[in-house]
Amino acid sequence: MLRLYGAPQGRLAAAVALFAPQWRAEAQWKSRGAETLLAVHADTPTGLKKAAQSLRSSFGADVYGAGDTSLAAAAVQALEAHDRLLACGDAAAGALLESRLEKVPGAEKVYDFGTMSYADAKVGPQIEKRARAKLGGEGDKPDSVRLALARAQAARRIVGTELAVACAERESDHVLVLKIG
């Protein structure tokens, strides 16, 4: 089973259609949002290997894992492999991430769980002050996405990380805004 993120449905069908007949392989997939689980079946181990290689080459970075690897676990592994720390600019983003990362092994090495950012008694208010100052003339009710970006930028600078995230809460959904470098 391969796990993909952001792979368009049409490309999945086209990639499976390119399986060589001698592989005697087929694939089924199920998507939820932008995440797709793709199961490959073949009559032989060689056919399975070639079909999986074909899919990996077709989708490249869209493939984030295989088997039971969750998107959260893949993100933690990637951050750890690149020696990166992810900081949060606000409690809403912290709550969204904590619920997904708290049981992932190694998450504490790559995510601050708010201890160095929004939840810190000194740093949290600094993040908010810097974010509001950046938006300056937008008044008491700035656009939620612009405010989230400003919070992520402020958290990244104040905490000293290359990656920071903040949450824009809208009427119908939540948007996580990631600021890189």
Regions found by a protein language model. Name each.
Residues 1-51:
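An accessory alpha-helical subdomain
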Residues 47-181:
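Short alpha-helical segments enriched in small residues
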